[in-house]
Amino acid sequence: MDLKDKLRHVMDFPKEGIDFIDITTVLQDPEAFRECMESFKTLAEKMGDFDLIVGSESRGFIFGAPLAYRMEKGFVPVRKKGKLPYKTVREEYDLEYGKDELEIHSDAIAPGEKVLIVDDLLATGGTTEANIKLVEKLGGEVTGIVYFIELMSLKGRDKLKGYNVDSIVKF
């Protein structure tokens, strides 16, 4: 199955000129979702050994949590500022028009733990860069980063040099 064919393109969303790639068409198709998760597992296995999977709010949760379950690893959510109930570590990152902040629980990753970052989309790499900084602030080691979709023209990998990066579908 070609998962690229299962994705829906929505023009001019969320603003004019954007070709939004909608993953819900894959999620609602059991066969496509299963294929997607098996592809994630294959990529994850190529990244070497790791202890935990980190996923960013919110679509990183969609793929990261089931992958962690499937691979018998822990899952660590990274959330937007103010959404986690315990002590956190925070990292600011750039958005197209401004800045935002991501947080992780301060005890989510032990020093030396190996981490795989999972997300739905690699565009500019800003969100992933913030995730990497959070993991490393806690003493974790990022062993790999895997995505469902990669937008090659935005050159997000440029911000991730030195890290093992792969994606299932490339546009």
From Swiss-Prot:
EC assignment: 2.4.2.7
PROSITE patterns: PUR_PYR_PR_TRANSFER (PS00103)
Highest taxon above the source species: Bacteria
InterPro entries reported for this sequence: Ade_phspho_trans, PRibTrfase_dom, PRTase-like, UPRTase/APRTase
MF annotations from Gene Ontology: adenine binding; adenine phosphoribosyltransferase activity; AMP binding
Subcellular location: Cytoplasm
Reaction catalysed by this enzyme: AMP + diphosphate = 5-phospho-alpha-D-ribose 1-diphosphate + adenine
Major subcellular location class: cytoplasm
Keyword Protease annotated: no
Cellular component GO terms, alphabetical: cytoplasm
Function per UniProt: Catalyzes a salvage reaction resulting in the formation of AMP, that is energically less costly than de novo synthesis.
Family statement: Belongs to the purine/pyrimidine phosphoribosyltransferase family.
UniProt xrefs under HAMAP family: Aden_phosphoribosyltr
PANTHER family: ADENINE PHOSPHORIBOSYLTRANSFERASE
Protein name (Swiss-Prot/TrEMBL): Adenine phosphoribosyltransferase
Native species: Ruminiclostridium cellulolyticum (strain ATCC 35319 / DSM 5812 / JCM 6584 / H10) (Clostridium cellulolyticum)
